[in-house]
């Protein structure tokens, strides 16, 4: 951990740890949480970024419960992997302003939670393929 991290942490009232639902990223987040604990920071919150519901459903990506079990800090938001983030970035527009973007809505919800509002977590559904729907018929 670099001195810049320690300097930033010293002045922080709140720490937002952002990770992705991958084992290596969660391990890194756990190390950061350990450093924050050693710095006597108590207000540590988690954001899980780039969630892919289809991969979670197949067991190829950690789900929020798995991540919470490992990190044991309060999760304040989950952000889906959303192609509209790339589109918005390429147009120079903030994705949070795009009301059709799942990620934009997730960012808005995180902001509202940070301001003290009680906002339910979004549920992300996987898109069923034609063959998945066909299988259900038989």
Predicted regions and their residues:
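P-loop NTP-binding site
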Residues: 74, 84, 105, 109-138
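A general boundary/transition motif marking the beginning of the first structured unit of a protein
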Residues: 55, 98-102, 122
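C-terminal boundary of histidine-terminating zinc-finger modules
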Residues: 91-105
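Residue-identity detector for threonine
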Residues: 7, 19, 89, 99, ...
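Arginine residue identity/basic-tract feature
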Residues: 27, 38, 50-52, 91, ...
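Conserved catalytic-core segment of NTP-binding enzymes
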Residues: 1-81, 86-87
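Short alpha-helix boundary/capping motifs
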Residues: 65, 94-96, 114
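Secondary-structure transition/capping residues
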Residues: 26, 78, 96, 118-125
